[in-house]
UniProtKB/Swiss-Prot annotation:
Transcriptional inhibitor with a significantly increased number of target genes in response to oleate. GO terms for molecular function: DNA-binding transcription factor activity, RNA polymerase II-specific; RNA polymerase II cis-regulatory region sequence-specific DNA binding; zinc ion binding. One of its GO terms (cellular component) is nucleus. Belongs to the OAF3 family. Keywords: Cytoplasm, DNA-binding, Metal-binding, Mitochondrion, Nucleus, Repressor, Transcription, Transcription regulation, Zinc. GO terms for biological process: cellular response to oleic acid; negative regulation of transcription by RNA polymerase II; positive regulation of transcription by RNA polymerase II. Its main location: cytoplasm. It comes from the Eukaryota. It is found in: Cytoplasm; Nucleus; Mitochondrion. This is Oleate activated transcription factor 3. InterPro entries: OAF3, Zn2-C6_fun-type_DNA-bd_sf, Zn2Cys6_DnaBD.
């Protein structure tokens, strides 16, 4: 009898097949788009035969159908109540109230990113509600649909000046203002008010242009008679920043420049203090040197100088000289910003380094860096790049992006030296032939040591290139990446010298380059779905690295300034992406996604603001190691500048949300005032670029605080409409219509009835219904502003009014050319003019209506009696909002 065949039970393992590449994928790996399509650039057409079921790793947030959605397939449940949050730290324990507000998800005592099942993007969690997590966290997943946004709706902004031409990267503060219609309108409103007012004021003044007008601010220092407030001495601040420019002109250097002994630090100070300080505090941040070799080179350099009395350019001593100058300058910067006392560091702090950077610039430009390069020359360029980032002067430009030319030179020089990705290829042969007389010589560094140092330098260059992508959205210069095995780099990046961080950073490079390709290949059509997925993956990978490093005793990432910096870089990038989403969805009238994005934007902005305030409150303590403040300050400064713009953008949109009360707006404006006070009081006296932005932000605060009387957005719309009708447009510059195309459409719509330019209700109604229809869908959206948490922040962080730099220019009585300037001696001392010139007239500049001197009565008004009455309306509006002294910095 024939035995029945055994029926083999088939395995019911769900399989998915991509219709593009037919690559089979198991249920544990169901990305969309799949990796093959990403590799071949077919992400738009990557679809599966069946909908991709979202597994445990990719949970979809709780959803509900939005009946009025223009995209019925999108289902999102927006959280309405801020009490649905509960904060937990890394161990799952509830935080105290202070940690809830101050230590956000990237805080020192909490995970860098939240440990959630759906791998949500960062969000600040507040309150003591009973629920464990909000109803919606993480970016929307659109059931396989790729969503696109326009990150440059008005294109790139290219600014042409006498000294330079700059194309602003898409995430800089200038680009944020240029992209956002609300911030653009506010910017042009300020420019119009400043231009018209200062033109009239200059006609009454004898000295009209910078830098003489800086002397005007000595009036602030004399405002409080008999009061000693050294912290508010604005003239000293100006003089301090003026020194940066005074030292630029030091004369030409000859081929054999005779060494000026006062420019070269003493040998004992360099060998015993500078190099020892650099070994323990700078080398982990600057993996550019083989330290024993550097010490030997410094010894040879001083021996040569003591013999000849000159810096030789034949044997490369000039580049060792530049390395010594830059290391000394950076060491002194680190010490001065940490205020560390002690005899071991006092020789460095007492060195006069004012001429060091100009000397380095002269040496760089006087040699053939455009044709050939050496290892020491490349090290000088990288040290200069590092210094420009940390320095208090305006090294990288106001937006921190004027570094591409130097980075291009660095990357090109590195490739000329053979430094690149090929060094990380296993088994790739590298033949290094070290000639006699070269520096470093074969006696001090063999070929293997050269290769190891080359690998470190390439990782450091890569770190800078990718960092500026996250900070400013700059296009990466290095357009290649390579997956590298961790084990192959253990010998190069050791824990002992502190370079282990760069071994981990290489692991993130492919993700960073993918983010770069998504935003740079076509900024007008960015796949935001793929971009958010990449950002989430980047956060997860960085969280894993954070966990790995924290599990070791040698290095704690919470105390490492590089981990601190990268976490802030990711937060800045997240906020900039969310802001771009808000602007794009508003333009497309996609109110569902817009509401979600604006809520998430405000949450991450509030979270980062609390981080900044906590950082400033802890600056005097050993937060992140006080010697690292000179390095970490820079990323916090950039974040604070960006956050102020985002806060302004949110405040200007509050009129659209009916659940927001008038007192809530005022709370946000006061929160902005507190944030700016901490920002400028901590950084305004140290960083020139921060100090320059103070005056613009003070005018912003004036405009926003005017909301207690009228809505600032309506007021600005009215002003711009009048300017378009009656104002003069300068030749060669972008006109108001070019900068504000949406308001130009509004102007065309209302131009048939000029009287409507004064009807605020009609203007706002036309804007919301015809020009910006997204406003019609906002009245039922409940924007959670976290008012109670903002109040807690305001109560917790106090600032002494006597030390408040942001507020001092308002509180002091301004006496421009007053009694202090009424005598011949004061005129001579303030303006350095010849004694034969008569003294300037006395002016008391307090309020518009109580002016004396040349500005009698209404003479300060912008338009003359013969001008249009409609334009005169703008004059009255400016007088209602601003104080005359607000315009002094712009004279």
């Amino acid at each position: 009898m024939e035995e029945p065949k055994k029926v083999t039970k088939s395995r019911r393992r769900p399989m998915l097949v991509c219709v593009n590449c037919r690559k089979r994928k198991s249920k544990c790996d169901r990305q969309l788009p799949c990796s093959k399509c990403i590799q071949h650039g077919d992400t738009d057409t990557c679809t599966y035969l069946n909908d991709v079921p979202i597994g445990k790793k990719n949970n979809v947030p709780n959803t509900q159908v939005t009946p009025n959605s223009s995209s019925p397939s999108i289902v999102i449940n927006l959280h309405q109540n801020g009490n649905d949050y509960k904060t937990k730290n890394l161990n799952g324990q509830d935080n105290t109230l202070l940690k809830e507000i101050n230590n956000n998800i990237w805080g020192r005592n909490s995970p860098i990113f939240p440990d959630s099942s759906d791998h949500s993007p960062p969000t600040q969690v507040f309150g003591d509600g009973p629920n464990l997590k909000p109803k919606v966290i993480g970016h929307c997943r659109y059931s396989g649909e790729n969503q696109y946004i326009n990150m440059v709706p008005k294109g790139y902004l290219i600014e042409v000046k006498r000294s330079s031409v700059t194309r602003y990267a898409m995430w800089t503060s200038t680009s944020v203002e240029y992209r956002d219609p609300y911030l653009s309108c506010m910017l042009m409103f300020k420019k119009g008010a400043v231009k018209a007012t200062t033109e009239q004021m200059k006609k009454k003044m004898k000295f009209k242009n910078l830098p003489n007008s800086f002397a005007l601010f000595t009036a602030f220092d004399n405002a409080d008679d008999g009061k000693d407030k050294p912290n508010l001495n604005h003239a000293k601040i100006f003089n301090k920043f003026a020194e940066y420019r005074q030292q630029k002109s030091i004369g030409d250097l000859s081929e054999d420049h005779i060494l000026d002994t006062k420019d070269l630090p003493r040998r004992q100070a360099v060998e015993n203090c500078v190099l020892m300080f650099a070994k323990f505090h700078l080398c982990p941040l600057l993996p550019l040197f083989n330290l024993p070799h550097l010490m030997e080179e410094v010894k040879i350099f001083y021996d040569n100088v003591e013999k000849t009395g000159k810096v030789s350019t034949k044997n490369g001593d000039n580049w060792i000289y530049c390395i010594i100058l830059l290391l000394t300058k950076i060491c002194k910067l680190a010490i001065c910003m940490s205020n560390i006392p002690g005899d071991d560091v006092s020789p460095i702090a007492q060195l006069d380094t004012t001429r060091f950077i100009p000397l380095v610039h002269k040496y760089i430009m006087n040699h053939n860096l455009f044709r050939k390069c050496t290892l020491h020359q490349l090290q000088v360029l990288l040290l200069l790049r590092f210094y420009n980032w940390c320095a208090p002067e305006d090294g990288d430009g106001q937006q921190g992006q004027q570094n591409s030319i130097l980075m291009g030179m660095i990357i090109s020089s590195a490739k000329e030296l053979g430094i690149g990705w090929d060094l990380f290829t296993p088994g790739f042969p590298v033949g290094i032939d070290i000639s006699d007389g070269s520096r470093p010589s074969a006696q001090h560094m063999n070929a293997e040591e050269y290769t190891t140092l080359y690998q470190k330098i390439w990782c450091y260059i890569l770190f800078w290139d990718r960092k500026m992508l996250l900070v400013n959205g700059q296009n990466c210069i290095i357009q290649r990446s390579r997956d590298t095995d961790y084990s192959l780099l253990e010998a190069t990046f050791s824990k002992e010298d502190g370079s282990e961080f760069f071994r981990y950073f290489i692991h993130l490079d492919s993700l960073l380059l993918e983010i770069n390709d998504l935003i740079s290949s076509n900024p007008t059509k960015v796949n935001i779905t793929a971009l958010n997925n990449c950002m989430t993956s980047l956060e997860e990978e960085f969280r894993n690295i954070h966990t790995i490093v924290n599990s070791r005793e040698i290095l704690q990432s919470n105390d490492d300034p590089r981990f601190f910096e990268v976490s802030w870089n990711i937060k800045i990038a997240r906020a900039c992406i969310l802001h771009a989403e808000v602007v794009s969805y508003e333009k497309e009238c996609d109110f569902v996604r817009c509401h979600y994005a604006i809520q998430k934007l405000w949450e991450i902005v509030l979270s980062m603001c609390s981080d900044c305030m906590e950082y400033w409150s802890q600056r005097s303590e050993a937060f992140l190691g006080s010697l690292n403040n000179f390095y970490t300050n820079r990323i916090v400064e950039i974040a604070a500048d960006r956050l102020v713009h985002f806060v302004k953008a949110i405040i200007l949109r509050l009129h659209r949300f009916h659940n927001v009360k008038a007192e809530d707006k005022q709370i946000l404006v006061q929160f902005m005032h507190k944030f700016c006070s901490l920002y400028f009081t901590n950084f305004g006296r140290e960083y020139f670029r921060c100090f320059k932005s103070l005056f613009n932000l003070k005018m912003d605060y004036r405009v926003l605080s005017y909301s207690s009387v009228k809505d600032p957005w309506t007021v600005m719309l009215t002003f711009i409409l009048h300017e378009m009708s009656y104002g003069e447009q300068p030749e060669g510059k972008l006109s108001l219509r070019d900068r504000l195309p949406l308001i130009a459409k509004l102007h065309d719509k209302l131009s048939y009835m000029p009287s409507s330019f004064k009807n605020h209700d009609l203007i706002l109604d036309a804007w919301q219904t015809s020009i910006y229809p997204i406003c019609r869908y906002d009245e039922h959206f409940q924007l959670n502003l976290y008012i109670s948490e903002i109040k807690k922040l305001d109560e917790h962080y106090k600032i002494d009014k006597d030390k408040n730099l942001f507020e001092s220019f308002y509180n002091n009585e301004v006496k421009l050319f007053g009694e202090e300037f009424g005598t011949q001696e004061s005129c001579n001392s303030a303006f350095q003019k010849d004694s034969s010139e008569p003294p300037q007239e006395t002016i008391t500049l307090d309020e518009w209506g109580t002016l004396s001197g040349p500005y009698e009565g209404n003479d300060i008004l912008l338009a003359s009696e013969t001008d249009s009455k409609a334009l005169r309306y703008n004059d009255q509006l400016i007088q209602e909002i601003f104080n005359p002294k607000d315009f002094l910095p712009f004279l």
